[in-house]
A protein has these predicted regions:
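A C-terminal junction/extension of Radical SAM enzymes
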Residues: 183-186
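Radical SAM/AdoMet-radical enzyme domain recognition
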Residues: 21, 29-49, 56-179
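Canonical Radical SAM [4Fe-4S] cluster-binding loop centered on the CxxxCxxC motif
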Residues: 1-26
Length: 186
């Protein structure tokens, strides 16, 4: 899906409203899986991203279940890159069952994260992310995070490190700002 419910200040894709978005269909998903399974690679990683991939969770389920039903010889890993704002208990159970690893974004302390990553329908994305990370921990689902650096972030290096430690993250993947879309002036 290219739909996203977030309005990140540095979005390179720029947020799409639901009425202008495109969702992957089962037909395209099946063709994509079949194509990947015919590759010479012995190991594959299917990564779900977007937009916000959880907005099309039914297709994620379809891809994983279809792949597992037809795959006979490849090692398949699944991963998800998401803001996690749409995460439900049903999704957690599914990701746990199929060993889906998860990556999200954590840009720093509460004020910095909320400044960078506002949701269109939720005032405090930092607190919401903290709740979803706690659920992932409770369910032993592997997760990681990416920190997108903007000029404002440079004032808070220790605070960013502290946030990652407090959230149980042992590594910080720092992504510099790419000057595309809304990110041009950040």
């Amino acid at each position: 899906s290219n739909y996203c419910n977030s309005n990140c200040i540095y979005c390179q894709a720029q947020s799409n409203q639901l009425n202008s978005c495109k969702m992957m269909t089962k037909e395209i998903a099946k063709k994509s899986v079949d194509f990947a399974l015919h590759s010479p690679q012995k190991e594959l990683n299917f990564e779900f991203q977007g937009g916000e991939p959880l907005s099309n969770f039914e297709i994620i389920k379809y891809i994983v279940e279809y792949t597992n039903s037809v795959n006979k010889e490849k090692t398949i890993q699944y991963s998800l890159v998401s803001n996690l704002s749409l995460l439900t208990d049903e999704m957690i159970e599914f990701f746990k069952k199929y060993n889906v690893s998860i990556s999200t974004s954590l840009d720093g302390h509460e004020l910095l994260h909320n400044y960078n990553r506002p949701l269109s329908n939720y005032p405090n994305t930092y607190k919401l992310l903290g709740k979803t990370i706690a659920k992932l921990k409770e369910n032993n689902i592997p997760y990681g995070a990416i920190q997108t650096t903007i000029k404002k972030s440079l004032k808070y290096p220790q605070e960013i490190i502290n946030e990652y430690r407090e959230k149980g993250l042992n590594n910080i993947f720092i992504r510099p700002l790419t000057p595309l879309g809304y990110a041009l002036d950040k």
